[in-house]
Amino acid sequence: MRVHLSPRSPLEFTGDLLVLGRAQGAAPSPLEEQLSEALKGALSAKAARARFTGAAGQSVSVDTLGLLACARVTLIGLGKEDSWAGLAVRDAVAAVSRAAQGERAAMVCAALPLRGARLYEAALGLRLGVYQFNTCKSADPEHPPHELTSVELIDTPLSAAAAADAAA
C-alpha cells in the first residue's frame, strides 16, 4: 500500500473513495459544503437523514454518480474536537481503511486534520485498519482478498471554526 501526503484539493481526487471527517457537534466544513453542493445536496441530505453528528464511529456514504471525479464519498465522525489526538486519530483512520474494504476501493483519499504528530498516528491507523490475519483461512477464488493500493492523505482543518482561525 502506497501512502502519501498530498497538497492538492480533495475535489481533484480521481480514485474510488474520498473520505472526509467532521468533529462531533461541529458545523459542516467548507470542504464538506463544497462536496455536498457538487453532489446536488446528496451528502448533506443523507447526513441529516442519518442524524449524523460527527460522533466517533458514525459514517454516511453516497455515490457520486459521475458528479465528482471520485466514485464515492464517505463522511466519518471524528469525535470530540478536544480529544482529536492519538487513539482517536488512529481509530478514525482505521475507519477509513475499513470503509475502503467495505467499498472494495483500491485508491482512497482521506481529507482529515493531520498536522504534526497526527500524521504518524494516521499512518499507524491505516496499517492497523488493513491488517487481516489470513494465515489459517482457505483461499476463496470467487472472493479474493481486498487490496488497498493507494491512500492519499490531505490535511484539512478539524472544524469550520479551526479553518477560520487558520485563515485569520
Feature annotation, model-predicted:
Residues 1-168:
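Short amphipathic alpha-helical segment within the helicase RecA-like ATPase core
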